[in-house]
């Protein structure tokens, strides 16, 4: 016994202790009471596909974390299957199940969409002739309104005539050398006063200033002031 241990120690690396084979038949990596795992399949040999019987399959995962329902994928027909489950002909990336009625409804929907896309033709616009209504008969005029309008018009005419007469009179008076016949024709009676028209248009320089010997004191005396000098009025206040 000692010889075997010494031989093992001699064959071992220096500085390492010899391994003890006390639990030679026990796998310490697996807890006690669990069955040993199934041996891994050889490389290139997977579970046969239930559809195409191909061995080119691979394990994906356990369904619902249940080791009794492993899920596999077949690379030949690109289908999944689960052990103990039902087979479905649904390819990878495939859509949902279609009902026969859905195809007809989809075709009708496409036809309706195409109809909406087509431009709608505008109906031809009909030209309509618009006939003007016949003019209604004028209503009878109100006699009160007619009388008021006539009176107002006559008053305006009278005032306009009076203004024109006054303008013509001023024209005759301001024109020098107007013949007396025109005044007689208008009935103004200016022929008796031949100098009436000339008196208005006398020369502006014809005004005669009072003489230098004119006594201003007489005027101020009549007004109640005795001093003939107007400058002293404000100096001799009572």
Swiss-Prot record:
A zinc finger (Dof-type) spans 47-101. The keyword Transferase does not apply. Residues 119-130 have a biased composition (Basic residues). Keywords: DNA-binding, Metal-binding, Nucleus, Transcription, Transcription regulation, Zinc, Zinc-finger. GO terms for biological process: regulation of DNA-templated transcription. It is found in: Nucleus. Residues 1-48, 85-155 are annotated as: Disordered. Zn(2+) binds at residues 49, 52, 74, 77. Changing residue 60 to S: No effect on DNA binding. Changing residue 52 to A: Abolishes DNA binding. Disulfide bonds: none annotated. Residues 1-13, 138-155 have a biased composition (Low complexity). One of its GO terms (molecular function) is zinc ion binding. GO terms for cellular component: nucleus. Transcription factor that binds specifically to a 5'-AA[AG]G-3' consensus core sequence at the MNF1-binding site. This is Dof zinc finger protein MNB1A. It comes from Zea mays (Maize). The lineage of its organism: Eukaryota, Viridiplantae, Streptophyta, Embryophyta, Tracheophyta.
